[in-house]
Swiss-Prot record:
Sections of the chain in a coiled coil: none
Name of the protein in question: Guanine nucleotide-binding protein G(I)/G(S)/G(O) subunit gamma-7
Compartments where located: Cell membrane
Annotated GO biological process: behavioral fear response; G protein-coupled receptor signaling pathway; locomotory behavior; receptor guanylyl cyclase signaling pathway
Chain's role: Guanine nucleotide-binding proteins (G proteins) are involved as a modulator or transducer in various transmembrane signaling systems. The beta and gamma chains are required for the GTPase activity, for replacement of GDP by GTP, and for G protein-effector interaction. Plays a role in the regulation of adenylyl cyclase signaling in certain regions of the brain. Plays a role in the formation or stabilization of a G protein heterotrimer (G(olf) subunit alpha-beta-gamma-7) that is required for adenylyl cyclase activity in the striatum.
InterPro entries: G-protein_gamma-like_dom, GGL_sf, Gprotein-gamma
Lipid moiety-binding region (S-geranylgeranyl cysteine): 65
Propeptide: 66-68
Keyword Acetylation listed: yes
Membrane topology, as annotated: Lipid-anchor
Source organism per UniProt: Rattus norvegicus
Length: 68
């Protein structure tokens, strides 16, 4: 039984390695420069950088707490 399990595991491993071998790879330097360029181009639309206008913020309290 363990022999068939080992064969099945080995086949799964080989299949996974074939999939990974087919993935296109690029150098980290190229990927990082593309990522930096993308971030710089889209920074003006990023709510974490520019903030969300109070009128458009769905999490802002509409009314203050009356209890306090």
């Amino acid at each position: 039984m363990s022999g068939t399990n080992n064969v099945a595991q080995a086949r799964k491993l080989v299949e996974q390695l074939r999939i990974e071998a087919g993935i296109e790879r690029i150098k980290v330097s190229k990927a990082s420069s593309e990522l930096m360029s993308y971030c710089e181009q889209h920074a003006r639309n990023d709510p974490l950088l520019v903030g969300v206008p109070a009128s458009e913020n769905p999490f802002k309290d509409k009314k203050p707490c009356i209890i306090l």
